[in-house]
Amino acid sequence: MSKVLSSGSTIGILGGGQLGQMLSMAAARLGFKTHIFEPSANPPASNVSSGFTQAEYDDYDKLKKFASSVDVVTYEFENIPTGALDIIEKECEIFPSREALKISQDRLLEKKFINKLGFKTASFCEVSSQEGLIFALENLGTPSILKTRRFGYDGKGQVKLGATSNPKEIWESLGEKELILEGFVDFSHEISVIGSRSKDGQISCFDPGENVHKDGILRTTTVPANLTTQQKTDAVLITAKILESLNYIGVIGVEFFVANSTLIINEFAPRVHNSGHWTQNGCTVDQFEQHIRAIAGWNLGNGERHCDVIMENLIGDQINKTNDLIADGSVSLHLYGKVDIKPGRKMGHFNRIIK
Ligand code: AMP
């Protein structure tokens, strides 16, 4: 039986980006210390944590030392190498579980898992050779989207294929890796549900948010999402079923396409999620606190939405809007303290209460 952590315990977090930063702040509010493990120097989370180890994920000595100095380990991104998890697991528990992580790390396993639960995904074909790509294209037709099975995020590692696409060139451009071809979903809009499950099996889901992506990167999330009552209930029940079937502990983000009024699951992330940032200003207990509560073995908090919110990301040079947003005064600003401005880099976000 997994232990219940008391305030004052230390939570280890793999990854020091903005999600690790906001997890650290939520943990600190509950009296926990955090220790960040991250390869790069001066990551956002290290400014708000009590411990920071700068090391690569294959530095097993540092990983062992890190894991033996904390009471539980969680993570802010899903592409953690298996070898690192093997080391950590010998020292302390990891939440969410390795099983959830393994499935979400591989788009093929993920789709098979979702279909097995009886839920819809885009149609798909495994692709592991140029001939395989030609065969998959004959099956699924165009438009379709070719994605790397692993290590993709924010639209990276994927390409949209049309009638004139050249399979040889495309296969080579994606690095001849293990791929998946997905039928193009002609959706009207995209939504996501942020759900959480505690160690004793309590489940709580935040209201679905409606997401707008540009170039594969999330731009805005609006709550409430444009859904019928039935669709909203279905999205929440699907999320709960995924949590239940994985015996999951922590927060999950499940992304859906809404196409012809049908909910089609795109993917899930076994962690706090960018499309859940609205909860920071729209709920008594936000996704970050909910995650810390769950992995600490505490009861989940009240995630009921008390207002309508729009969350907007500040991407790349949109961070230059900061002075205007400060002058505006009516939005809640969340800045990550990143120094280098790069195209596509998430620099901050803000939440605006609509009503
Ligand atoms: P992903 O990295 O798989 O979440 O994809 C990023 C974004 O690309 C999604 O949020 C969608 O806007 C779009 N997208 C991904 N897969 C598909 C698909 N099969 N059909 C249509 N659009 C897609």
Task: Spell out what each predicted region is.
Residues 280-281:
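A conserved FAD-binding loop/helix module that cradles the flavin
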Residues 1-109, 131:
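ATP-binding N-terminal substructure of ATP-dependent carboxylate-amine bond-forming enzymes
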Residues 313, 318-321:
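Extracellular/lumenal mucin-like low-complexity stalks
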Residues 173-227, 232-265, 269-277, 289-302, ...:
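Phosphate-binding core of ATP-grasp and ATP-grasp-like enzymes
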Residues 305-314:
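Short glycine-/aliphatic-rich beta-strand segments at the starts of folded cytosolic domains
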Residues 32, 50, 92-93, 119-122, ...:
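A structural micro-motif
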Residues 103-192, 196-242, 355:
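Active-site nucleotide/adenylate-binding loops and adjacent lid/helix of ATP-dependent enzymes
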Residues 341-354:
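An anion-binding loop in the catalytic cleft
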